[in-house]
Amino acid sequence: MQNQVIQLGNIEIGNNKPFVLFGGMNVLESRDMAMQVCEKYVEVTQKLGVPYIFKASFDKANRSSIHSYRGPGMEEGLKIFQELKETFGVKVITDVHEIYQCRPVAEVVDIIQLPAFLARQTDLVEAMARTGAVINVKKPQFLSPGQIGNIVEKIAECGNNKVILCDRGTNFGYDNLVVDMLGFNIMKKVSQGCPVIFDVTHSLQCRDPFGAASGGRRDQVTELARSGMAIGLAGLFLESHPNPNQAKCDGPSALPLSKLEPFIAQMKAIDDLVKSFEEIDTSN
C-alpha cells in the first residue's frame, strides 16, 4: 500500500513512520492551563522519544447548549498558540469553523483542522486548502470511511496534497459512537496513502439524550487506544486535563494529565512492535 509522508519541520507524519502524538486539551481554558498542559506533554514525549504536536481549540463553535463555554476566541487563542510555540518549540494544530478564519490561523499554527460536522462544506474546504497549510480532516460521524476520498479530492483540486485523515468514531444509533477498526485501512486506500490518525478521546463520547453536554467513557481510553495503535497508524489524537471532572468541555472523555506518561509509554510500545512486523498481503 502506498504511504504518503508529510514533513513538518523535523516531524515525519506517515502510516509507516513512528507515530506522532497530537495531544493537548479540548479547548483553551486559560493561558496558564495551556502552558501547564503543553509543558507536561513536552516533558513526557521528549523522555519517551515520541514526536509531538500540541492541540487545542480557540472556539468550540458546535457546543450543544448556548450556555456552554466556547473558548477565548480566535485573537486571544492565536496569542496563546504563538507563546506556546516560542516557549516550548512545539508545532500546533487547531480547528477553523469559518472561511475568514483560515488565513490568519494558518499564519500562526502548523496544521489547520476541518471539523467533522463541517467536512462536507465545500467553500470551507477550499478556503482551507488554498492556505497551503497541512490540513487534518476529521471524518464525520455520519460518513463511511470510503467517502473520505471525496474530501481529499476537493483539497487536491485546490493544489494542496498535504492531508491527514482522522477517525473520531461513527454513529451507532442515537447518542453513541463506535470505532470501526476496519475503516482505518479503507481511509488509507481511498486517499492513496494519506496519513491516518485516531482521535481516541472524542470516540469515547456518549450523550444523555436530553442533556446539554456530552458524556464520556474515559475509563476505556487505554483499551480503545491500544486497539487503534495495533492497526499501524500515523498518529494518535488525545485530549488531557489536569482535572477532567472540572474541564469546561468533554471532561468525561479526557485522559487525566497525571496518567499521560504510562499511557504514552504503552502506545509507543505497541506502535514499535506493530511497525517492526513485515506486512503480509492476504488479498490473494
Curated annotation (Swiss-Prot):
Keyword Mitochondrion: no
Location relative to the cell: Cytoplasm
GO molecular function, one term: 3-deoxy-8-phosphooctulonate synthase activity
Enzyme class (EC, first level): transferase
Protein family (similarity comment): Belongs to the KdsA family.
GO biological process: keto-3-deoxy-D-manno-octulosonic acid biosynthetic process
Protein name: 2-dehydro-3-deoxyphosphooctonate aldolase
Keyword field: Cytoplasm, Lipopolysaccharide biosynthesis, Transferase
EC code(s) of this entry: 2.5.1.55
HAMAP family the record matches: KDO8P_synth
Keyword Cytoplasm: yes
One GO cellular component, as annotated: cytoplasm
Catalysis performed (reactions): D-arabinose 5-phosphate + phosphoenolpyruvate + H2O = 3-deoxy-alpha-D-manno-2-octulosonate-8-phosphate + phosphate
